[in-house]
């Protein structure tokens, strides 16, 4: 019996070392991508009606507040908005068909809101946190302000209708 026991250990050890190694390969893959969806922004219009040219203030006057309605399926974290307009930069939109060769023309200045009204200027192409957000998720509403001004010489402005567009994108982060 001692002889069998003595052989048992080397035989078992040899069997373990010589046996094929069984290894389970990863054969299930789980993947996807988590996203935070952008808000769906409704069209908004700011209409100044008739403005007398001589009443324009170069740095911006004729203030109008306006709201932008949106549907935000995700509303955790902080809302950020970005406003762009035909590749323009700075804090104003040069209204098409009102500018001269020297760059003079009608400007629209955009401002954020705060608890007491008008806030800081909005820089086109940069993210900003809206100062006033109302509504309950998913229906949200932000308040912004617009002012009319001009660049250059007031005499270069021509009477007539004007129109400009911009794109607002909103999401939470």
From Swiss-Prot:
One GO cellular component term, please give it. extracellular region
Extract the Gene3D superfamilies matched here.
Fimbrial-type adhesion domain
The protein's predominant localisation is secreted
The role this protein plays is: Fimbriae (also called pili), polar filaments radiating from the surface of the bacterium to a length of 0.5-1.5 micrometers and numbering 100-300 per cell, enable bacteria to colonize the epithelium of specific host organs.
Pfam families referenced in this protein's UniProt entry, alphabetically: Fimbrial
Q: Where in the cell is it found?
A: Secreted; Fimbrium
Signal sequence interval, chain numbering: 1-24
Highest taxon in the source lineage: Bacteria
In its UniProt entry, the species of origin is given as Escherichia coli
What's the protein here called? Fimbrial protein PrsE
InterPro entries, A to Z: Adhesion_dom_fimbrial, Adhesion_dom_fimbrial_sf, Adhesion_dom_sf, Bact_Fimbrial_Adh_Pro, P_pili_tip_fibrillum_PapE
């Amino acid at each position: 019996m001692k002889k069998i026991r003595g052989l048992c250990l080397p035989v078992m050890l040899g069997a373990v070392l010589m046996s094929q190694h069984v290894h389970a390969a990863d054969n299930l893959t789980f993947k996807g991508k988590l996203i935070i969806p952008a808000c769906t922004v409704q069209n908004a219009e700011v209409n100044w009606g008739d403005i007398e040219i001589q009443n324009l203030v170069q740095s911006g006057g004729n203030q109008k507040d306006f709201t932008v309605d949106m549907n935000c399926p995700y509303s955790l974290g902080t809302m950020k908005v970005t406003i762009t307009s035909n590749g323009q930069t700075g804090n104003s939109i040069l209204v098409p068909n009102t500018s001269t060769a020297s760059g003079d023309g009608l400007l629209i200045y955009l401002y954020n809101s705060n608890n007491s009204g008008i806030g800081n200027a909005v820089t086109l192409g940069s993210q900003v946190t809206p100062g006033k957000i109302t509504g309950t998720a998913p229906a949200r509403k932000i308040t912004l302000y617009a002012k009319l001004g001009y660049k250059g010489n007031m005499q270069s402005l021509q009477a007539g209708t004007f129109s400009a567009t911009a794109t607002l994108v909103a999401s939470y982060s």
